[in-house]
Amino acid sequence: MDILNKLLLKDLQEIAKVMEIEIGVGQKKDELKRIISNSLEENNTELAYGTLDTAPEGFGFLKETTLGKNIYMSASQIKRFKLRRGDQVLGEVRKPIGEEKNYAIRRVLKANDNDLAALESRVPYEELIPTYPTEQFVLGIEQGNISGRILDLISPIGKGQRALIIAPPKAGKTTFISSIANALIEGQKDSEVWILLIDERPEEVTDIKENVEGATVFASTFDDDPKNHIKVTEEIIEKAKMKVEDGENVVILLDSLTRLARAYNIVMPSSGKLLSGGIDPTALYHPKNFFGAARNIKDGGSLTIIATILVDTGSKMDEVIYEEFKSTGNCDIYLDRQLAEFRIFPAIDITKSGTRKEELLLNKNQIDDIWNLRRLLNDYDNKVSATSALIKAIKTTRNNDELLAQLPKVLYK
């Protein structure tokens, strides 16, 4: 009854229809719950909810279920309803018969909170039409959000952006990711924010969970098996794609692409070829597939991925991974070790950071003012002076519109 209690009246009506239960016109929610419950009892079945995991042979299992057990799903059911790995499935479930070991789905009732007709008509993610981002995430809503305001000026991020945060060690990337996540949650109520932490320290996972309220945090820490890093990542990207297929907007902040590529390099079977640094070329395919999934869908939803990638670690492998990814994003945000050593935070290198096709995210007046700002910042002797001047200007103005209106005076106060 717990599942029935959480369902809306229209959901109960749809379930009754799929279960071939005759119901009268205008029946109330409590009556429908009782009728469905009686039908389940007569059939010796029950309702269960879980996440579909498919096998190469075509069949699958619902995992992380409300029953606490894996539930078998036949290949014919998966094919009929065009179900895929990661789908959240609600079904009528029967107990094992004879020598069977698992509970099994008798009927599929709903998936991803949609009715069955919507499932059968959905367009696969890969067939949706990608376009350049045209709707900006405004991150600098609050005066004190320096990171968000700098990004809005220097590297604006839009729905469907594929952004790389190029980060050397000790440049404050974890704090930077937290500030972006908080800004997204504060200003973008129509987008889900997910944080994916791969091969991170457990205490950093705890820190982000405590400091970012409203985001869903997924993590596989450095003491987990690399196979778990991959499992978590692949489940997350499939869930995100399904939400975008339904017209929703999802933002994934990944820390980091480098460690994800390292995990694939350990787990993937060797191709017999090695790039410089000891990385197998085939190990880069899956992380690229993950990062490349970010896109803005024409007349639909969007998947935005903001991912860190490590540089200047002293590892040749990390250098090769960066070289493979550096031309794949459409927004580059460079963090700088020198700025961090001078205790200038956020340590964003404003001379190197930028967004491709930023004119699609900003209006004509904003573009002209921001390009003027860039020219003024380039007049400084070095990036330390330029970044310090911009941060000071941000602190003395209420918002970016006010800052741009006071150029060039505000930079030389």
Swiss-Prot record:
Its EC number is 3.6.4.-. ATP binds at residues 158-163, 170-175, 201. It comes from the Bacteria. It is an enzyme of class 3 (hydrolase). Residues 45-115 form the Rho RNA-BD domain. One of its GO terms (biological process) is DNA-templated transcription termination. Belongs to the Rho family. HAMAP family: Rho. This is Transcription termination factor Rho. It comes from Fusobacterium nucleatum subsp. nucleatum (strain ATCC 25586 / DSM 15643 / BCRC 10681 / CIP 101130 / JCM 8532 / KCTC 2640 / LMG 13131 / VPI 4355).
